[in-house]
């Protein structure tokens, strides 16, 4: 198969879809790989690193799209990239379609087949291609929250860990999944007073068993959320409904109940955000203020640590990339129903029901058992 990797063009996105090691694996298996010049530069890989492993370096994204059967990226294709997609293309990347009708319609209109990292599953019902970036974003969230809390940035002027004789900051983490537990671990490690809320009792039991000595946990009732939010210095939004738009946990009206200068870090912003007042920001302009409350809503947080993020993502995606390249998407998805769960768009149709429900678009997913007859 002809595999292509363009340079990411989302603002301040420094990750890359393929590492030189991934190129080596693909080339050794008889596939050709085309990489846009400087695609890996932000993650610490130069063109010669890719050339040594057998990649063909080209000067533009258009050349990558023109040559490739499968396009491997990190972030959702931007408008100019979507114009280069066509029927016969296989796109493998993060998509986050539920809050993005424009991208969804463009992908449908392109006729491409699009498999989203964030909806690929595993035997335990987990999200193996979302997990590594959730770990990174979760661990970054307290750092970004601590920065946002600084007075010069509009925050409360509270040090996360406090000092002897002065209480530490109170951190509320909404959601006890991969993002939430990683955020809570780091915040607790920085000395903060941390509470994690979740609605899953089994998850709360796990958190209590594993992390009970580090931070508190509680059931995420509306009353508990409101009370703890009103006392918090930093609130980290870490909820996820796979492939669907994130639920709104703090309304605009509730901002008046928070302490002035409270920092909100919305890790769920890729899926629309879990605070009503959230809107996507960039690393260049990451925070904004509404009613005295500071919001940090960078949509590609792991891009700030591109080297770590690229290596972690590559470790997770490579087995799936190899399977897709070796077998083609139909056989690969037929053999692996968890990869099939990643199918979001195919042949001019939306195929992921949670996105259809969020956007009011009819979905038509092929039957898994009938994949072998597709062409």
Name the predicted role of every residue range:
Residues 209-291:
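Rossmann-like adenosine-cofactor binding region
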Residues 2, 8, 79-169, 298-300:
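Glycine/serine-rich phosphate-binding loop and adjoining beta1-alpha1 elements at the start
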Residues 76, 136, 177-178:
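Residue-level detector of alpha-helix initiation sites
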Residues 118-144, 148-159, 269, 274-375:
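Adenosine-phosphate binding glycine-rich loop
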Residues 6-45, 152-240, 287:
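Glycine-rich phosphate/diphosphate-binding loop of Rossmann-like nucleotide-binding domains
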Residues 2-110:
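An N-terminal-biased, well-structured beta-alpha scaffold segment characteristic
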Residues 56-61, 115, 216-221:
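Short acidic-hydrophobic, aromatic-tinged amphipathic segments that line or gate anion-handling sites
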């Amino acid at each position: 198969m002809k595999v292509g990797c363009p340079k990411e063009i989302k603002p301040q996105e420094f990750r890359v879809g393929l590492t030189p090691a991934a190129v080596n694996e693909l080339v050794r298996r008889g596939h050709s790989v085309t990489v846009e010049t400087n695609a890996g530069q932000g993650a610490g890989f130069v063109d010669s690193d890719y050339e040594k492993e057998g990649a063909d370096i080209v000067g533009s994204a258009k050349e990558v799209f023109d040559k490739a059967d499968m396009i491997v990226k990190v972030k959702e294709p931007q408008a100019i990239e979507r114009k280069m997609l066509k029927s016969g293309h296989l796109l493998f990347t993060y998509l986050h379609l539920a809050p993005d009708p424009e991208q969804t319609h463009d992908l449908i209109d392109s006729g491409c087949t699009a498999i989203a990292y964030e909806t690929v599953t595993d035997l335990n019902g987990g999200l193996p291609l979302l997990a590594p970036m959730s770990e990174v974003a979760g661990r970054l969230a307290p750092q970004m929250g601590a920065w946002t809390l600084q007075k010069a940035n509009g925050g409360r002027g509270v040090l996360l860990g406090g000092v002897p004789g002065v209480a530490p900051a109170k951190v509320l983490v909404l959601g006890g999944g991969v993002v939430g537990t990683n955020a809570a671990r780091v915040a607790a490690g920085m000395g903060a007073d941390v509470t994690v809320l979740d609605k899953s009792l089994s998850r709360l039991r796990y958190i209590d068993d594993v992390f009970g000595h580090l931070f508190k946990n509680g059931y995420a009732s509306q009353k508990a959320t409101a009370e703890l939010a009103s006392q918090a210095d930093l609130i980290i939004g870490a909820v996820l409904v796979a492939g669907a738009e994130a639920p709104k946990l703090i309304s605009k009206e509730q901002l008046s109940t928070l302490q002035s200068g409270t920092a909100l870090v919305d890790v769920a912003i890729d899926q629309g955000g879990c605070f009503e007042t959230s809107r996507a920001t960039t690393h260049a302009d990451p925070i904004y203020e509404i009613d005295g409350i500071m919001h940090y809503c960078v949509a590609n947080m792991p891009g700030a640590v591109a080297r770590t993020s690229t290596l972690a993502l590559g470790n997770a995606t490579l087995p799936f990339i190899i399977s897709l390249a070796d077998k083609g998407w139909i056989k690969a998805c037929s053999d692996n129903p968890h990869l099939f769960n990643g199918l979001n768009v195919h042949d001019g149709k939306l195929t992921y029901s949670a996105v259809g429900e969020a956007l009011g678009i009819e979905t038509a997913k092929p039957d898994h058992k009938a994949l072998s007859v597709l062409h």
